[in-house]
Amino acid sequence: LLSELMAKAGGRVLGIDAGHAQISVATLHARDAGVTLEYEQATAEQLRDRNNDPFDLVTCMELLEHVPDPFSVVRACAELLHPGGKVIFSTINRSLGAWLKTIVAAEHVLGLLPKGTHRYENFIRPAELATWGRATNLRVLDITGVDYRPMTKTFYLVPEPRANYMMCLARPTADD
């Protein structure tokens, strides 16, 4: 859905996912919505290894906490950017609040997600993500928390990254 929104806003968009079924569903959804964009079955690392056309923007939403080597994904995303390009990661903080909201409430109490979707030890503290970014020559531009209201089914931004959060990082230019 994010890929479709970016394409509707005028972006030339390539959406990737490692799963064939997810790519098939996304392709059909975009076609039915009349949105023009490309989808490929690939991981960030696979795309990086075969891509010769750097991106202005890479988004990696709600993935890092589900992969065995999140630093590898951060590095691949950094290497997909041209100088001055930005990457936005969305993930979950390893905190008590995140555990209560994501695992206890969303998975066990409200049933918004299947039980076992998340593992607390795979959540990523903002400082860890920032360190991985710096290790791949990215600089942190912004970080903001994201919260969810189950009664209205709406997401909203909050100042502190207590549970879900987004971090925007940039690849420096020659002038930086």
At which residue positions do the language-model features occur?
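Conserved SAM-binding strand-loop segment of SAM-dependent methyltransferases
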Residues: 32-47
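Conserved class I S-adenosyl-L-methionine
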Residues: 86-110
